[in-house]
UniProtKB/Swiss-Prot annotation:
<feature type="compositionally biased region" description="Acidic residues">
    <location>
        <begin position="1090"/>
        <end position="1099"/>
    </location>
</feature>
<feature type="compositionally biased region" description="Polar residues">
    <location>
        <begin position="1276"/>
        <end position="1285"/>
    </location>
</feature>
<feature type="region of interest" description="Disordered">
    <location>
        <begin position="1082"/>
        <end position="1102"/>
    </location>
</feature>
<feature type="modified residue" description="Phosphoserine">
    <location>
        <position position="1119"/>
    </location>
</feature>
<feature type="compositionally biased region" description="Basic residues">
    <location>
        <begin position="1"/>
        <end position="13"/>
    </location>
</feature>
<dbReference type="InterPro" id="IPR011989">
    <property type="entry name" value="ARM-like"/>
</dbReference>
<feature type="modified residue" description="Phosphoserine">
    <location>
        <position position="1230"/>
    </location>
</feature>
<feature type="modified residue" description="Phosphoserine">
    <location>
        <position position="1117"/>
    </location>
</feature>
<feature type="modified residue" description="Phosphoserine">
    <location>
        <position position="1221"/>
    </location>
</feature>
<feature type="modified residue" description="Phosphoserine">
    <location>
        <position position="1251"/>
    </location>
</feature>
<feature type="modified residue" description="Phosphoserine">
    <location>
        <position position="1094"/>
    </location>
</feature>
<keyword id="KW-0539">Nucleus</keyword>
<feature type="region of interest" description="Disordered">
    <location>
        <begin position="1176"/>
        <end position="1384"/>
    </location>
</feature>
<feature type="modified residue" description="Phosphoserine">
    <location>
        <position position="1225"/>
    </location>
</feature>
<dbReference type="InterPro" id="IPR012978">
    <property type="entry name" value="RRP12-like_dom"/>
</dbReference>
<feature type="modified residue" description="Phosphoserine">
    <location>
        <position position="1250"/>
    </location>
</feature>
<feature type="modified residue" description="Phosphoserine">
    <location>
        <position position="85"/>
    </location>
</feature>
């Protein structure tokens, strides 16, 4: 066993500086600095407290309440209730935190007066202004002005006896805004009005409509040119709320449209916040006006008439929005102000589906017309607008218009090399077909084959995985939502057969066409095809199924996809059709081994099959395999025999699949004899037959199936009885024997009553004839136990009196074994059967328990001393059943009093199952005492267990834990303190079990009890933990750690450490670790929240955005708050805006694909496919070619015919050597990126070594002294793309000159190669000489492990000296003086 070693005395290294942070002067953790800063304003530092005191008013209140009770009579619930009634208001005027709205006004919630700086100046209790009170910042001038106005209004309302309702604040704020002259007063009033106007009742807004709307319009005119964006946003928000509250008749006035036009004008504002606020307001008015929403049922107390208004399909102002948007699509706007067009499209995304049908048609026509423009951004936004129109599934877009619109969108198909636009195009069409299917299914099915054909024959053949996956998802949704609905019934399938057949044919073509990466998607798509239309289109789906199965191979990469699709086909088409298309046997009836992979799939996917097909085809084939199996076994051909054995077993294994809801259960009369013979004669076929019988007898089968299988009970049950009474040989047969008993129990319940009675009588005779406690006796006892459950109450009573009661009473009878071990076995089985009878939900068993409860109670109580330990769990179940079946059982009944000690004694023995039963029994008894008001008496009874042995004490503590968990709030404080003291005594004992139980009790005590009560006993708990022995503390270390964590949640680690003795290093160290872990977790949580806030603010790109409902939009409108209150949100929005702008700059590139033989006509509709974005496959090629330029043959270097590198003299001198081919490639790349200007020529050492990125890097990086670790430094050992190659050395790096191109000179025959470093030699002096533009003349000596060897050190030092001597370093100033000079 390991030991605790204290780490307090170790000299740790301490916290070190992070790399590169040694000059940081502001650390992240500033605990001591914050402590010093908090004492800055104290007048006399010598009198200031060293630490902040924990004495607060709340702590004083809690302390007084925890001490102000009578421990003998007050319960824990009383203390908790008194704590919940605390109010920390110190106001003398009697103002409370809750108020009610006066009659006639809308009910408004109230808030607690939070103790903040703003609470000292404003006692507003209206929930609308909660954020101002709680998030007040004294540094904000706007907050100060708002708080002053709110305080004044609150005071006026209270002086006049108001209830601080939203109506009162609304009226007063409007008066304040109209009377204010200074801008800051108006801004503060408007901000407060925006916070509370959403809760103002609609009748008030209707009554004050003219005056309020006129004031808002004048404010818009006044602040139109102002730099304060927030006031404009708040005014727009207030005006939208007012307009939404007006009824349908109010929109017949011109003044209402005048106010609406004022908001509409700001929807294309240049400022994004103002523009988004206006667009949001327009959308709310169009969709969220009072007459557009469902009518709210009026209450009985209200006087309003509950007259349901006719549902309005479109808003009266929608036509005005449509005219406004169409005015922005004029040619001059498209040519000069495309940004305005984009803003208009953004407005249409949220409002178009609320227009009337004529306006939707006009807008869509203009959208299609501007989509021919070359601006890809405009076209993408048009796709998004159409997508939102289809996504909302508005009834204003009728079926005919939707079908025409889908046909027109087909003409605007982009080129498939442009991945993003193609996916957007397909997604828009998919959503349009889904909407058309909801409106008129036959029109959708007429238009759907065209889209499927385009997706399969063209888009699926793309080499871009992203496009293939997107198209596959669209096809899947169309199959699930459109085709499946068209094939729901036989009539619908007949009407749409031609369209569905075309879709299947288009998909089947892709199975026959050569393809590679798409094969996985095509195979999986067919699984959805089988699910959608497999039941009624079997003939059309048979050829695709045959094609898919031909591709199956165990080594295939798509094996799993093929198996999944075949299983879907089996479920939809049925095993008969699948096996007809793909037969398991050839024409001669011989099993084809290559088709054996279908057998496991058939068992898993078969459902609703025919038993006749199984009998005529599968069983016949299995019999044939069985004959060949035996023939090969007799011929001693083991391999073939084993193959046919497996095939035969797999064919019989199909039986459970054919039993899942069979179509012809009446055919069981022909199949039952075959099954009975197989069960009796072939043990290897029994498992699948058992599974099939369980399927036929299950609850999910029909009544006809149960009746059919019940008629053959005499055929199966006797055979099953014989199998169960046979002694198993091995674990496999033992497991199968248990399975047989499960089949018997389920089959007995489905058999007819006369068959049950007959089998019960025969089983009793067999039981009586068997020897006691023998294998046969136990087997027949289990069979009788399975049958007796379904007998009548009279039959159960007779069996109980004859075979069960003598064993329970341990009578001296011939039916009771005399041997102790055999008696234990008998008692265990008898108690289990009695528990099953008493807990069963069958009517006969419940009747038996009620009628014989007194007899059962007497037998159970008398047999307490004679029962063995292994049957205690069943005894406890029986006692609990007896207690539950008594409706008016008294708490002091004899059954209850005798069940308490038995439950405590067996609380935690032998198994967890018994512990759960004992806990349930104790909780039931606890509930009885609680109902009688004697819960403390029950605790006194349990206290007697503390005087027992170790196990009894442990169980008593755990029983108290169960009582505390269920009825702890009803215990008196004195009783609770007594129990806690007793548990603390056993906590410090040497017994491990007692200590573990005591800690479990303390954990429950901390969870259940109120904090003040736990605080009163906190010192005793901590001192008891410290006083534990080392052995028990080590044994319960995990439980102690959990206890300390729970304590640290309710109290601080510092408070707990104050109660721990100083010599207990273990507890102190654990508390310290918990404190560190808590702080670390808090920092992580804060960082995660900050990251989530920043990520939530980012804009979701693409068409698959969240579809907001009008309720979500209305909820968003409630967050109209001052800007400086949402600083964090604005920071996140700014970050997201910067990210979006950065992405927008990257996405502005647009390219036109040209044909050198044709002229591009941008006005032609077909030219829309030639406009590509930067994300297309063709435009990505130049960028990829630049990145992969180093991957050219030979790395881009020129080579001779013999493989040598050709390096010109110009390259060695670093001069320009550009050839025409390189210029052409660079110019092509620049043209691909849309650049026309010529780049200035830069001298390069090699033709293809540098790139445009290197030139840009040379221009941007200033000249500086390189450090040793710089990537451009030669010392660093790093290489970059801009490094220059210099010839020199050996091999292919040798100098390429005329004289020494070969190793030997042809003329002289001597070697012309010079020793390395000779070019640094001086002609007139000794030593080496540094040359400009070359490396320093260093001698690089390799460092090996031999240099570290002591025996070889002297030899290596001599080598080093020779090197120095050769370099002239040891000759002093004579030889090395010139070399040792410092060169700049």
């Amino acid at each position: 066993m390991g030991k605790f070693r204290s780490k307090l005395k170790r000299n740790g290294k301490g916290k070190t500086w992070s790399r590169g942070e040694s000059a940081t002067s502001n650390p992240t953790q500033m605990k001591h600095r914050m402590k010093a800063k908090s004492r800055f304003f104290q007048p006399n530092l010598s009198l200031a407290a060293a630490t902040t005191t924990g004495l607060t008013m709340e702590a004083v209140h809690k302390h007084e309440q925890s001490q102000a009770f009578n421990a003998e009579t007050t319960t824990v619930n009383d203390v908790a209730g008194s704590l919940r009634s605390f109010k920390l208001d110190d106001d003398d005027d009697g103002m409370s935190g809750s108020g009610t709205a006066p009659t006639g006004t809308a009910p408004t919630g109230t808030i607690k007066t939070f103790q903040t700086f703003a609470s000292n100046y404003s006692g507003c209790s209206n929930t609308c202004f909660q954020k101002l009170v709680t998030s007040f910042r004294s540094s904000s001038a706007l907050h100060k002005e708002m708080l002053a106005i709110l305080s004044a209004l609150t005071e006026i309302i209270r002086e006049n006896g108001g209830g601080e309702s939203s109506t009162e604040y609304f009226l007063l704020l409007m008066e304040q805004i109209e009377a204010a002259t200074e801008e800051r007063d108006i801004v503060a009033g408007v901000t407060l009005l925006a916070m509370g106007i959403n809760s103002v009742p609609a009748p008030v807004l209707k009554k004050r409509f003219a005056q309020t709307a006129d004031t808002m319009q004048r404010l818009l005119q006044r602040f139109m040119e102002s730099t304060n964006q927030s006031v404009i946003r708040h005014v727009i928000g207030c005006l939208s709320v007012i307009l939404r509250a007006q009824d349908y008749a109010a929109w017949s006035y011109s003044s209402t449209f005048q106010y609406f036009d004022a908001i509409l004008a700001f929807s294309i504002h240049s400022q994004p916040k103002i523009r988004k606020a206006a667009q949001h307001a327009i959308a709310l008015i169009i969709h969220g006006s009072c007459f557009m929403l469902p009518a709210i049922k009026s209450d009985d107390n209200e006087m309003d008439e509950a007259v349901e208004q006719p549902k309005v399909k479109h808003h009266p102002a929608s036509s005005r929005v449509a005219k406004f948007c169409l005015a922005q699509f004029k040619p001059e706007v498209l040519a000069n102000a495309q940004t305005t067009v984009l803003h208009t499209l953004e407005l249409l995304k949220d409002t178009l589906y609320g227009f009337k049908t004529e306006d939707i048609r006009s807008v869509c026509e203009h959208l299609l017309s501007i989509m021919t423009a070359a601006n890809v951004l405009v076209r993408t936004n048009c796709f998004q607008t159409l997508y939102s129109l289809f996504l909302k599934k508005s009834p204003n877009l009728n079926a005919s218009l939707c079908a025409k619109l889908l046909a027109a969108i087909h003409e605007y198909r982009p080129d498939k090399s442009d991945i993003r636009q193609t996916i957007a195009w397909v997604t828009v069409l998919k959503e349009g077909h889904l909407h058309l299917a909801t409106m008129q299914l036959d029109l959708c099915m007429q238009a759907l084959p065209r889209l499927i054909d385009v997706c399969t024959t063209d888009l699926w053949l793309s080499d871009q995985k992203e496009l293939v996956a997107g198209v596959s998802n669209c096809i899947k949704e169309l199959l699930q939502d459109c085709v499946s609905r068209a094939c729901a019934t036989a009539e619908d399938a007949q009407c749409n057969r031609q369209s569905v057949s075309r879709i299947i044919a288009s998909l089947h073509k892709m199975l026959n066409a050569p393809f590679g990466e798409i094969s996985r998607f095509v195979i999986l798509i067919f699984s959805f095809v089988f699910e959608a239309c497999g039941k009624l289109f079997g003939s059309e789906l048979t050829p695709p199924l045959m094609t898919i199965c031909k591709r199956y191979d165990t080594q295939s990469a798509h094996r799993l996809q093929i198996e999944h699709t075949v299983i879907s086909a089996i479920k939809a088409l049925g095993p008969e059709l699948v096996l007809t298309a793909i037969p398991l046997a050839d024409g001669k009836g011989v099993m084809q081994l290559e088709r054996s992979w279908l057998l496991p799939l058939l068992r898993e996917g078969a459902n609703g099959a025919s038993l006749q097909f199984f009998k005529e085809k599968i069983v016949a084939l299995a019999m044939d395999c069985q004959l060949k199996w035996k023939e090969f076994a007799e011929a001693k051909n083991n391999s073939s025999s084993h193959i046919y054995e497996l095939l035969c077993c797999q064919l019989w294994g199909l039986f459970p699949g054919f039993c899942r809801q069979p179509r012809d259960p009446e055919y069981l009369r022909y199949l039952a004899p075959t099954l009975g013979a197989a069960v009796e004669k072939n043990p290897e076929f029994r498992p699948p037959i058992y599974d099939g019988l369980m399927e036929l007898l299950g609850d999910n089968q029909s009544a006809e199936c149960h009746q059919a299988i019940g008629q053959y009970a005499k055929n199966f049950l006797p055979r099953l009885f014989n199998i169960y009474t046979q002694k198993p040989n091995g674990t496999y047969e033992a497991d199968q024997r248990k399975r047989v008993l499960e089949v018997i129990r389920l089959y007995i319940s489905r058999a007819p009553a006369d068959v049950q009675l007959e089998l019960f009588e025969n089983a009793q005779e067999q039981l009586a004839a068997s020897a006691l406690a023998s294998f046969e006796y136990d087997a027949f006892f289990d069979i009788n136990a399975a049958i007796v459950r379904v007998q009548t109450c009279k039959g159960i009573k007779a069996y109980f009196d004859k075979y069960m009661a003598p064993i329970l009473r341990n009578d001296k009878s011939k039916l009771v074994a005399k041997d102790e071990q055999k008696l234990k076995k008998q008692q265990r089985k008898t108690y289990e059967l009695l528990r099953e009878l008493m807990t069963s939900e069958l009517p006969s068993c419940q009747k038996f328990t009620r009628k014989n409860s007194i007899v059962l109670q007497q037998i159970l109580l008398d047999s307490f001393n004679t029962s063995c330990n292994v049957c205690q769990a069943s005894r406890l179940h029986c006692l609990k059943s007896l207690i539950d079946c008594h409706s008016n059982l008294a708490y002091n009944d004899q059954l209850v009093m005798k069940a308490i000690p038995e439950a405590v004694l067996n609380y935690k023995e032998f198994s967890n199952y018994k512990e759960q039963v004992a806990e349930q029994l104790i909780k039931s008894i606890t509930q009885l005492y609680h109902d009688a008001g004697k819960i403390n008496d029950f605790v006194d009874i349990l206290t007697a267990g503390f005087a027992g042995d170790e196990m009894l004490v442990t169980n008593t503590i755990l029983a108290f834990r169960a009582v505390l968990q269920q009825q702890g709030e009803h215990l008196t404080v004195a009783t609770l303190e007594f129990v806690l003291q007793q548990v603390s005594v056993f906590l410090v004992q040497k017994s491990r079990k007692q200590a573990e139980a005591a800690i479990a009790f303390l954990i429950t005590f901390i969870k259940v009890m109120p904090i003040p009560l736990v605080a009163n006993h906190l010192e005793a708990i901590m001192r008891s933990l410290s006083a534990m022995t080392k052995d028990t503390k080590r044994y319960c270390r995990i439980q102690i750690g959990y206890l300390l964590k729970k304590l640290c949640i309710r109290f601080s680690p510092g408070e707990l450490a104050g109660f721990v003795p100083g010599d207990d290093d273990v507890i102190h160290r654990r508390l310290k670790m918990i404190r560190k872990r808590t702080r670390r977790d808090l920092r992580k949580k804060q960082n995660l929240e900050a990251q989530e806030d920043s990520s939530d603010d980012e804009l979701v790109s693409g068409l698959q955005e969240k579809s907001y409902t009008i309720d979500d939009m209305l909820a968003d409108s409630d967050s109209d708050l001052p800007e400086d209150m949402d600083a964090k949100d604005e920071a996140g929005a700014a970050a997201a805006a910067s990210k979006r702008s950065k992405n927008a700059k990257q996405q502005k590139s647009t390219y036109i694909r040209e044909d050198p033989d044709e002229i591009v006509d941008l006005a032609d509709l077909k030219s829309i496919g030639n406009v590509l974005t930067s994300g297309s496959a063709q435009t990505a090629t130049p960028a990829q070619s630049q990145k992969t330029k180093a991957q050219l043959p030979n790395g881009g270097f020129k080579t001779a015919d013999d493989g040598r590198l050709i390096i010109s003299d110009k390259a060695l001198r670093g001069q320009g050597g550009n050839d025409q081919s390189d210029d052409d490639s660079d110019s092509d790349a620049s043209m691909a990126y849309g650049t026309v200007a010529k780049q200035p020529k830069v001298k390069r050492g090699m033709e293809d070594d540098s790139s445009d990125e290197d030139k840009l890097q040379q221009k941007l990086v200033p000249k500086r002294v390189r450090k040793g670790d710089d990537a451009m430094s030669m010392k660093s050992g790093k290489t970059t793309a801009s490094s220059r190659y210099t010839a020199g050395g050996k091999g292919i790096h040798r100098q390429l000159t005329a004289g020494n191109s070969d190793a030997m000179s042809v003329k002289s025959g001597k070697s012309t190669s010079r020793p390395a470093g000779s070019e640094y030699g001086s002609k007139k002096a000794k030593g080496d000489m540094k040359k400009s533009g070359k490396l320093d003349p260093y001698a690089y000596i390799p460092l090996t492990r031999n240099n570290l060897n002591k025996r070889k050190r002297s030899m290596n030092s001599r080598k080093f000296k020779s090197v120095l001597r050769g370099a002239g370093a040891e000759n002093g100033g004579a030889g090395g003086g010139r070399v040792s000079k410092k060169y700049k």
